[in-house]
Each structure stands twice: as structure tokens, then as C-alpha cells.
Swiss-Prot record:
Gene name as annotated: rpl14
Record protein name field: Large ribosomal subunit protein uL14
NCBIfam families linked to this entry: PRK08571.1 (NF006344), uL14_arch (TIGR03673)
Protein function: Binds to 23S rRNA. Forms part of two intersubunit bridges in the 70S ribosome.
Keyword line: Ribonucleoprotein, Ribosomal protein, RNA-binding, rRNA-binding
Domain of life: Archaea
CDD domains hit by this protein: Ribosomal_uL14
PANTHER family: 50S/60S RIBOSOMAL PROTEIN L14/L23, LARGE RIBOSOMAL SUBUNIT PROTEIN UL14
């Protein structure tokens, strides 16, 4: 996985509910666990922009609900800082469902996607409407 240039704060914890910003049929997802997180005892696992997590689909089509899926965070409200000094934040926290190889399950992504995600997940970038 490619390293990110920007300073990404881990602002989302397990149990956070986020909008699913693709057309897979899931509308609201809840973070169950964070992949590749090796923490300290009793510390709540946190995730930020570009992190992959296991999520439970809470709202959506009947065939998608109550399933565990992999997802990546594509937007977060907490601002990120780029090396040139620009600070970037979004209006919502959003995720996109992915498969085991890191490719998106849907065929369309709603909303803007930051450049850091475009570098790490090129397939998500090709489907995004706007890259910021």
C-alpha cells in the first residue's frame, strides 16, 4: 500500500457510523474493526482517511443489510494537512465498499475524493466524480 504524503489524523473510531458513498446498495455502515491495527491494551482502534476497515451494513437494500464487508474511508470531517500547508476537510464522513484486492465493489462514487485516496486506490479515483 502506498504511503500518504499528507498528515492524516485518525479521527474515526470503531462504532462510528458513516455514509456509504457508492452504488452497492449500502447506505449506512458501522465500523466493526480496523484492518492492520496493532494497538495498545484497552485503546480504542481508530482510523482515518485511506484506512481499510471491516464494516457492518446498517441501512440499505435487504440483500446488503446485516453483512460484514471491507471498506475504505474516502472522506472525513476532521481536516487533513498537506505538505504545502493546505488544510482539507469535508462535510461528511464517507466510505466505499471494496473487495479483498482493494477494488471498489460499486461502479459509481458520489461526491469528491481527495488526491491522497486517488494515489493509494487508483480504481476508486477512476470512478470518482471529483478529485480534490
Amino acid at each position: 500500500m502506498k504511503a500518504m504524503q499528507a498528515k492524516i489524523p485518525r479521527a474515526l473510531a470503531t462504532g462510528s457510523r458513516m455514509v456509504c458513498s457508492d452504488n452497492t446498495g449500502a447506505r449506512l455502515v458501522e465500523v466493526v474493526s480496523v484492518d492492520r491495527y496493532h494497538g495498545v491494551r484497552r485503546r480504542q482502534p481508530c482510523l482515518g482517511l485511506g484506512d481499510v476497515a471491516t464494516v457492518s451494513v446498517k441501512k440499505g437494500t435487504p440483500d446488503m443489510r446485516r453483512k460484514l464487508e471491507k471498506a475504505v474511508v474516502i472522506r472525513q470531517k476532521k481536516e487533513i494537512r498537506r505538505p504545502n500547508g493546505i488544510r482539507l476537510s469535508f462535510e461528511d464522513n464517507a466510505m466505499v465498499l471494496i473487495n479483498e484486492r482493494g477494488e471498489p465493489k460499486g461502479t459509481e462514487i458520489k461526491g469528491a475524493v481527495p488526491r491522497e485516496i486517488a494515489e493509494r486506490f487508483p480504481k476508486i479515483a477512476s470512478m470518482a466524480t471529483t478529485i480534490v
